[in-house]
Amino acid sequence: MSDLLVLLPVRHRRENAIQCAASFAATARDAELLIISDADDPSYDGIDWPQGVRTRVMDEWMPYVPKINKVALEVAAGYKALFAIGDDCVFQTPSWDRIMMGALEDMGGTGIVYPENHRRRDVPEQWMTSTDITLALGWFANPVLKHYWTDNTWAEIGRRAGCLKFCPDAVIEHRHYSVHKPTEYDAIYQQCEQFGPHDERAFQAWRASQMHADVTTVKKLLDAKGAGYKLTMKRDRG
């Protein structure tokens, strides 16, 4: 079983999902990919997915954040890290998963790592989080949100807790319509963008009232892990 599970929520974009999964299969060495679709969306029926790719069908549609949180909390205990992407992403770098997991191990196994995506470097649009952080917080994506500002959330927590790492050697291209001209500004983008005003307000409210507590939770986890690591090293040295 892999240490890393990639979570890919999908909706009405069959060709995107096929392309993303194919690029994953061509480049990943150890990771697994879980494609999360909805019972009311037959777009993905009959697809012969590559090896290492599994599927999960949700009973009812939910926005991106509650959907990915529900699945993440169900599977987190079985992995060292979870990685969130969208179906407009294409994996480019061979062994990107080993590169990113190596970066996480360099941080002691606890932290947030994000790849070069050719769109933004200031925030982790596609984030990989160690599952001890997910379990400590009780969420994988900020639960006050519906779709947007998840990247800003992890940027705030990671920088303030000192556990955010950009991994430029792992390239996973984000072919968002704003930077990739061939990408159509389709109904899915338009539907998601309706959540924008709500999510901005919710993020700012979280930042004012809850962020400090969440950062403290992660700092305590890092401190406890650091103390345990030092104790183990001391015992090993006799």
Where would I find each of the regions flagged by the language model?
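Active-site nucleotide-sugar/metal-binding loop of Leloir-type enzymes
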Residues: 69-81
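A short, glycine-/small-residue-rich helix N-cap motif at loop->alpha-helix starts
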Residues: 59-67, 146-149
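Short beta-strand-to-loop acidic/aromatic patch adjacent to the donor-nucleotide binding site
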Residues: 79-90
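A conserved acidic beta->alpha catalytic loop
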Residues: 14, 35-48, 89-90
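Short beta-strand/loop segment that forms part of the nucleotide-sugar
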Residues: 30-41, 56-58
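C-terminal catalytic/acceptor-binding lobe
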Residues: 152-238
